[in-house]
């Protein structure tokens, strides 16, 4: 009798475990907006002439774990100014999607590019400071940047 009750509850237990296994990983997952901030925002600082800025930041922001991210851009502007780009000039993203926006003014950025011959785990980057318009993909509610698409020179 007790065995029959246990067997009757087994499918319910399996279902609960499956649901928990599906829901639980998403609870700790970084949102696309938070990932954008981690990978691209550095409002507090500017590398000045620090040649190791990219090496330090790429490592500190977890972009050299398991592989060397080939290219990354850090934006040295207040987060609210970068978020405002989502309500500026609409442009087509590199991948053809229609949710990209170009900043109306140029912004202080640092381009980090993997140097030739650099291999994981010894990721080495070239640091280049620039003043460029940025193009970001935006989504969500609130509508915020979730992807850094490009930087472009002032077209005037």
From Swiss-Prot:
Question: Segment Disordered: which positions?
Answer: 33-52
Question: Bias category Basic and acidic residues: which stretches?
Answer: 33-43
Q: What Pfam families does this protein map onto?
A: RnaseA
Encoding gene, per UniProt annotation? RNASE1
Listed CDD domains: RNase_A_canonical (cd06265)
| Family affiliation | Belongs to the pancreatic ribonuclease family.
- Name the UniProt key words of this record, in alphabetical order: Disulfide bond, Endonuclease, Glycoprotein, Hydrolase, Lyase, Nuclease, Secreted, Signal
Descriptive protein name: Ribonuclease pancreatic
Its quaternary organisation is:
Monomer. Interacts with and forms tight 1:1 complexes with RNH1. Dimerization of two such complexes may occur. Interaction with RNH1 inhibits this protein.
InterPro entries on file: RNaseA, RNaseA-like_dom_sf, RNaseA_AS, RNaseA_domain
Q: Which enzyme class, named as a word?
A: lyase
**Could you cite one Gene Ontology molecular function of this protein?**
ribonuclease A activity
Q: What is its EC number?
A: 4.6.1.18
Q: Which residues carry out catalysis?
A: 40 (proton acceptor), 147 (proton donor)
A cellular component term from Gene Ontology for this protein is: extracellular region
Catalysed reaction, written as an equation = an [RNA] containing cytidine + H2O = an [RNA]-3'-cytidine-3'-phosphate + a 5'-hydroxy-ribonucleotide-3'-[RNA]; an [RNA] containing uridine + H2O = an [RNA]-3'-uridine-3'-phosphate + a 5'-hydroxy-ribonucleotide-3'-[RNA]
Q: Listed disulfide bonds for this chain? A: 54-112, 68-123, 86-138, 93-100
* PANTHER family reported in the protein's UniProt record: RIBONUCLEASE, RIBONUCLEASE PANCREATIC
Q: Which residue positions does the secretion signal occupy? A: 1-28
